[in-house]
């Protein structure tokens, strides 16, 4: 288990250390053979090397089996040219590893339904995974451009691009509730028709997983009206960008949301939240998303599904027993992490 750890900026080092404490405890109990090395990334790397994704970090990522990332950015670096800002390091990291699938779970933890903007009876039981295609579609399609009179972008997908992200979704569903919803706009767009047909072809290789199709506008409505009925949702880049942000508000705090980016190279696991420089160093950061990102790493990088579920269960118990400040409690980073570790033991 060789992991490159990129703590980053702001609260990144604090929440990443919390995740590492959990991983070290599991390693001691289960003999996982955990080996990790810490590398500078984002603003911290700019301060040390003059660029957000320097060569030593790049080499460390290439040699690792997984990347555990904290958070990047902060007002200190906002005045830099765009091409060397901390956030540019994220784009370079994802591109260098050809990470084509972004996994964003949104789970309303039992007992915390009150945090959701939805009614408690609607929020109860929500546990949805959005699988977003990350490197194709209208964000990257050519031609694109703008003149004084008009602007244009191209929505384009190849069969291999759709097939590979669909497989990620079906494989994830096999470990969950065995239900995939594919989201498109096949009633209007040829790309949507192509997407739907290709996902259906991939789905035939997973007879144990149910496949359903939804138009993106209807799906947005369903995620608000009845989100608990969904398991795994797979869609293209722009629709996934929108739907994953919609789903992210369901649990009630960004501090609860992990993510994974998978592809041909080293997979990356990171919290959805930002660097929160206003609370950095105060011991107040909620490490839940970082700990759950480590759980996703156990599952998707190393196939340790049972251990990942064990971490998730410990986090769920800790959230009820010792909620962090952003959830209305008073448990700081260390106290919350200690509670998770106690429930893991």
UniProtKB/Swiss-Prot annotation:
Residue numbers binding Mg(2+): 217, 241, 245
Positions bound to substrate: 94, 104, 132, 217
Keywords (A to Z) from UniProt: Amino-acid biosynthesis, Branched-chain amino acid biosynthesis, Cytoplasm, Leucine biosynthesis, Magnesium, Manganese, Metal-binding, NAD, Oxidoreductase
Matches recorded under InterPro entries: IsoCit/isopropylmalate_DH_CS, IsoPropMal-DH-like_dom, Isopropylmalate_DH
Cofactor field: Mg(2+); Mn(2+)
Pathway: Amino-acid biosynthesis; L-leucine biosynthesis; L-leucine from 3-methyl-2-oxobutanoate: step 3/4
PANTHER family: 3-ISOPROPYLMALATE DEHYDROGENASE
Name assigned to this protein: 3-isopropylmalate dehydrogenase
Residues annotated for NAD(+) binding in this entry: 74-87, 274-286
Pfam families: Iso_dh
Site residues by UniProt (Important for catalysis): 139, 185
GO MF annotations in UniProt: 3-isopropylmalate dehydrogenase activity; magnesium ion binding; NAD binding
E.C. numbers: 1.1.1.85
GO biological process, one term: L-leucine biosynthetic process
Assigned GO CC terms: cytosol
Recorded catalytic activity of this chain's protein: (2R,3S)-3-isopropylmalate + NAD(+) = 4-methyl-2-oxopentanoate + CO2 + NADH
SUPFAM superfamilies according to UniProt: Isocitrate/Isopropylmalate dehydrogenase-like
Cellular localisation: Cytoplasm
Similarity comment text for this entry: Belongs to the isocitrate and isopropylmalate dehydrogenases family. LeuB type 1 subfamily.
Subunit structure: Homodimer.
UniProt function note: Catalyzes the oxidation of 3-carboxy-2-hydroxy-4-methylpentanoate (3-isopropylmalate) to 3-carboxy-4-methyl-2-oxopentanoate. The product decarboxylates to 4-methyl-2 oxopentanoate.
CC cofactor note: Binds 1 Mg(2+) or Mn(2+) ion per subunit.
Major localization listed first in the record, in broad terms: cytoplasm
């Amino acid at each position: 288990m060789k992991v490159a750890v990129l703590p980053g900026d702001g609260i990144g080092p604090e929440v990443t250390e919390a995740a590492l404490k959990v991983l070290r405890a599991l390693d001691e109990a289960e003999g996982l053979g955990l080996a990790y090395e810490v590398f500078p990334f984002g603003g911290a790397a700019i301060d040390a090397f003059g660029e957000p994704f320097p060569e030593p970090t790049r080499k460390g990522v290439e040699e690792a089996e997984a990347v555990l990332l904290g958070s990047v950015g902060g007002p200190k670096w906002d005045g830099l040219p765009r091409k060397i800002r901390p956030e540019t390091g994220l784009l370079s990291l994802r591109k260098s590893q050809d990470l084509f699938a972004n996994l964003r779970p949104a789970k309303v933890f039992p007992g915390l339904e009150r945090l959701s903007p939805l009614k408690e009876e609607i929020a109860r039981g929500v546990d949805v995974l959005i699988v977003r295609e990350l490197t194709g579609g209208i964000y990257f399609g050519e031609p694109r451009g703008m003149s004084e009179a008009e602007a244009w972008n191209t929505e384009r997908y190849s069969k291999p691009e759709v097939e590979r992200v669909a497989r990620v979704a079906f494989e994830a569903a096999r470990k969950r509730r065995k239900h995939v919803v594919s989201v498109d706009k096949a009633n209007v767009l040829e790309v949507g028709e192509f997407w739907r047909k290709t996902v259906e072809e991939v789905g035939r290789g997973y007879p144990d997983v149910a496949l359903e199709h939804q138009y993106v506008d209807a799906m947005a409505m369903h995620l608000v009206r009845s989100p608990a009925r969904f398991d795994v949702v797979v869609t293209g880049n722009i629709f996934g960008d929108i739907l994953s942000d919609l789903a992210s508000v369901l649990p009630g705090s960004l501090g609860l949301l992990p993510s994974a980016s998978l592809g041909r190279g080293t997979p990356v696991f990171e919290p959805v939240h930002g660097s929160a420089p206003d609370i950095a160093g105060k011991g107040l950061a909620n490490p839940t998303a970082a700990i759950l990102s480590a759980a996703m790493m156990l599952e998707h990088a190393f196939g340790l599904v049972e251990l990942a579920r064990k971490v998730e269960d410990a986090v769920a118990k800790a959230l009820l027993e010792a909620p962090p400040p952003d959830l209305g409690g008073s448990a700081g980073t260390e106290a919350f992490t200690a509670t998770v570790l106690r429930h893991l033991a």
